Design a protein with these regions (language model features):
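Conserved ankyrin/ankyrin-like repeat signature
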Residues: 32, 64-65, 95-96
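Intrinsically disordered, low-complexity regulatory segments in ankyrin-centric signaling systems
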Residues: 1-39
Length: 103
């Protein structure tokens, strides 16, 4: 799967099913996430297993991305197996937890 011309993802990886937004959110790439949102990507987009960009950002301690996604309409209450808050709590990311609890 090729996401774009500068993507580090392999072109022929049939096992990788991450949408671009979830991928870049998991890496903490604010610039790429902002660009996708400007292009109209749904901030609540999920992968095949229901994992959202907000969950990816929260679980990986990317507070700036969590704030960005929330400001663009990401559903804080969304739950696949866990909510973004629960994932941040399990990973012990105190700032992300505090922010999500403040909403």
């Amino acid at each position: 799967m090729k996401l774009n011309s500068f993507s580090p993802l392999p072109e022929d990886d049939e096992e990788l099913h991450l949408p671009e937004l979830v991928y870049w959110a998991s890496l903490g790439d604010v610039e790429q996430v902002e660009q996708l949102l400007v292009e109209g990507i749904d901030p609540n987009q999920t992968d095949d297993e229901g994992y959202s960009a907000l969950q990816a950002a929260a679980e990986n301690d990317h507070l700036a991305l969590v704030k960005l996604l929330v400001s663009k309409g990401a559903n804080v209450a969304y739950k696949s197996e866990y909510t973004a808050l629960q994932l941040a709590e399990m990973a012990e990311h105190a700032e992300v937890v505090a922010y999500l609890k403040s909403l």
